[in-house]
Every structure is written in C-alpha cells, then in structure tokens.
C-alpha cells in the first residue's frame, strides 16, 4: 500500500531497501526535488512517514482544525472558494499535548541511549515551548506511568524499560552536551523564534529535578524501585 502511494505521488521511497514488514517501527523517506533547487543536509529532500506497531494515542481530545488559506478566504468573504476546495474547519480527534510532551522527554532519552543526536534536538525546543502549558500534578504523574508502561512494550524505547532512571539519563545528556551541536546546526537554522541552547538545557534540568519522572516500572517480584 505504501509503495503504491509513493508511485501515485511520484515520490520514490529512497530507503525502501532498509524497511522490513515485520518490524515494530519503520520510516519511509518519500523523496522529492525542491522547486528552488535547494540542497542542504539540514533540510533533507524527503518527507518521512513513520509507522509503529503497538503504539496508539491516549488520551485524546477533539479540536477544531483549520488552515491559513481557508481562514483568509473566510475573512475576505470568499466562502465559495472555501467550499470548492473543501477548506472549512472540522473537528479531529488528536493526542493530548501532555502525552506528546511526555513522549518527547522519553524520545530524547531513547536517542541518547542509542547514540543518535542528528536531527533529534528539535525535541528540546518543543519541550521548552510546551513546558509552560504543563500542569505537573498527580494526573500528569499518572500519565507518565501509563505512557512508560506503553512505551516499554516497544523495543525502540529503551528508556522506558525496567530499571532505567529517566532523570539520571536527562542529566547525563545535558552534562555531556550530547545534543548541542545538532541544536545549533538544525533548530536555530529553522526556527524564527530562536531559543538559546543553554535555556532549553536548563529547562530539561528542571524537568529532571521536578520528580515527576522519578517513577520506575514494576519488576518481576511485583516491587518497584
């Protein structure tokens, strides 16, 4: 099915040989040629489609989805064009920001454990921007536990496994400046609202010291540590 979509779009999957149907996780790179003739390793010439078995969104909320073009056309009274091109707002079930935030913290830990930094420092920026929206209460702590248990079922999520101290992993990649080079090369290049590396790292240290990620998975004998 995915290959058929690629052919219909005229966007060859340039890493097709690296994917396998029996994997929990796959990433398909739908390649394209920039109309501007832009060639920069910081902006890969492909759209990445990621698939993961056993991963599902929770909790979810219904939000109104719109787009800039549709909003503009409504503002200038061209609802005829909005209707012609199907640009009206609609409701969509989306994953709660709290879950996205938690996933990003675990993802940074996963990539550090796996020794992968390239193009992943963007999570530092996202977490920084989302942090003021988070309420670190009991419900949030419970969602962390549920998310960790869910991620622990997937082999690509090592930081969710039993015995891994997430706050320690966060402090370690902060101390070693693991994401610093990538952050300066990628995140600052694309973002119009630049946030200094030191600020996003200080934010991660606060998360590590907050205590909300201190919970551990239960281990064999039913105890937790």
Region locations from a protein language model:
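Structured mid-to-C-terminal alpha-helical surface segments
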Residues: 1-225
């Amino acid at each position: 099915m995915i290959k058929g979509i690629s052919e219909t779009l005229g966007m060859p999957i340039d890493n097709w040989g690296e994917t396998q149907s029996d994997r929990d996780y796959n990433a398909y790179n739908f390649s394209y040629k920039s109309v501007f003739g832009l060639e920069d390793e910081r902006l890969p010439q492909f759209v990445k489609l990621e698939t993961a078995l056993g991963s599902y969104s929770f909790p979810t909320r219904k939000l109104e989805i719109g787009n800039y073009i549709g909003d503009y056309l409504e503002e200038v009274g061209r609802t005829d064009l909005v209707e012609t091109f199907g640009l009206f707002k609609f409701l969509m079930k989306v994953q709660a920001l709290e879950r996205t935030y938690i996933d990003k913290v675990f993802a940074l830990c996963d990539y550090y454990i796996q020794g992968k930094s390239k193009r992943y420092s963007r999570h530092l920026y996202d977490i920084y921007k989302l942090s003021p929206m988070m309420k670190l209460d009991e419900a949030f702590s419970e969602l962390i536990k549920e998310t960790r248990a869910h991620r622990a079922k997937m082999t690509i999520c090592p930081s969710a496994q039993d015995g891994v101290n997430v706050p320690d992993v966060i402090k370690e990649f902060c101390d070693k400046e693991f994401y610093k080079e990538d952050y300066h090369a990628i995140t600052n290049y694309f973002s119009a609202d630049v946030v200094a590396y030191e600020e996003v790292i200080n934010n991660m240290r606060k998360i590590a010291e907050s205590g909300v990620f201190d919970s551990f998975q239960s281990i064999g004998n039913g105890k937790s540590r």
